Regions:
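Conserved nucleotide-binding/hydrolysis micro-motifs of P-loop NTPases
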Residues: 35, 66-68
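Rossmann-fold NAD(P)-binding glycine/threonine-rich loop
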Residues: 63
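Structured adenosyl-cofactor binding patch, chiefly the S-adenosyl-L-methionine
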Residues: 70-114
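S-adenosyl-L-methionine/SAH cofactor-binding core of RNA-modifying enzymes
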Residues: 1-56
Length: 114
C-alpha cells in the first residue's frame, strides 16, 4: 500500500495528464465522491441546461481508484457524485454513457427503463 504522500503524488501525476487533455473551452464535470448525487431526471435537466447555456463541449472526468487531484477538482465547472461506491474505471465509463443516453431520452419524453 502506498503512503498518503505517495497517493497524493499519484493523484497529482494523473491530474496533470487529465488537465493536459482538457481544452479551455470545455465545460468540465468531475465525478467526485464529495459532490451531490442526482436522479436520472435531475441529470437530464443538468445536461439540457448546459446545452441552453451554450456549453456543448462537455468533458466528464473520471478519476482513478484514488480519486481526482485537487487541481482537477478546481478546474471542474461542476461536480457530480454517481455513487459512494467504488467501480472499475471501464465499468463506470459504460454507466456514465448509459446515463447520458438516458438523459437525452428523458429530454425527448421518450420511454426509458426505470
Amino acid at each position: 500500500n502506498a503512503s498518503e504522500k505517495e497517493e497524493l503524488q499519484i493523484k497529482d501525476k494523473e491530474g496533470e495528464l487529465i488537465l493536459s487533455k482538457i481544452k479551455d473551452n470545455m465545460f468540465v464535470v468531475a465525478m467526485d465522491l464529495n459532490a451531490k448525487q442526482m436522479t436520472s431526471e435531475e441529470f437530464s435537466k443538468f445536461i439540457e441546461t448546459q446545452g441552453v447555456m451554450g456549453n456543448s463541449n462537455i468533458a466528464f472526468v473520471i478519476g482513478g481508484s484514488l480519486g481526482l487531484s485537487q487541481n482537477v477538482i478546481k478546474r471542474a465547472n461542476h461536480k457530480i457524485c454517481f455513487s459512494k461506491m467504488t467501480f472499475p474505471h471501464q465499468l463506470f465509463r459504460v454507466m456514465l454513457l448509459e446515463q447520458i443516453y438516458r438523459a437525452f431520452r428523458i429530454m425527448k419524453n421518450e420511454p426509458y427503463h426505470k
